[in-house]
C-alpha cells in the first residue's frame, strides 16, 4: 500500500482567505493511503520545502500531494524538493487550489469542499503513478525539407 503525504499551502492569504486549509488538510488526512497531512503558510518557501523533505524521510512516503497554486508556478520546485529527499520526482501531484478554488469562489464552504475534491483527485492520481526515469534516444541528424515556399 502507498504511503502518501499531503501538504496544503496557505499561499499567505491567497488561499487561506477563501479556503479553510486546516479543514482540507484534516479531511485529506483521512483518505486511504494517506499517512501524513499538514498545512503551512508557504510550502514553496525553504521552510515549507524542509517540512516536505522531513516528512518524506520520517514517514517513509511513497507519494506526495501538494495542494497549492498552479503547477506552472512551483511544480519544478516541488519535484526538486521530493527528489532531494530521495523520492522519485514523478511520485508528486499538485492540486491547484488557488486558481481553481480560492480565486473563483467567494463562499468559503464551497471553496473548501472543492479543494477537498481536487485533493482527493490528486491522491487518486498519485496512487496510480509509477516512478519514471529520464531516458535518451539516438537521433539521426538529417532533415528533408519539402516545399519551402
Model regions and ranges:
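Residues forming the flavin
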Residues: 1-149
Amino acid at each position: 500500500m502507498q504511503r502518501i503525504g499531503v501538504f496544503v499551502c496557505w499561499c499567505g492569504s491567497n488561499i487561506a482567505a477563501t479556503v479553510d486549509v486546516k479543514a482540507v488538510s484534516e479531511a485529506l488526512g483521512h483518505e486511504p493511503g494517506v499517512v501524513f497531512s499538514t498545512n503551512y503558510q508557504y510550502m514553496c518557501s525553504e521552510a515549507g520545502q524542509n517540512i516536505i523533505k522531513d516528512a518524506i524521510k520520517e514517514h517513509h512516503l511513497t507519494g506526495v500531494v501538494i495542494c497549492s497554486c498552479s503547477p506552472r508556478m512551483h511544480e519544478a520546485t516541488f519535484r526538486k524538493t521530493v527528489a532531494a529527499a530521495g523520492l522519485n520526482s514523478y511520485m508528486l501531484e499538485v492540486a491547484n487550489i488557488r486558481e481553481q478554488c480560492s480565486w473563483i469562489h467567494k463562499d468559503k464552504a464551497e471553496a473548501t469542499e472543492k479543494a477537498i475534491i481536487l485533493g482527493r483527485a490528486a491522491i487518486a492520481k498519485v496512487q496510480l503513478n509509477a516512478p519514471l526515469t529520464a531516458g535518451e534516444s539516438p537521433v539521426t541528424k538529417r532533415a528533408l525539407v519539402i516545399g519551402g515556399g
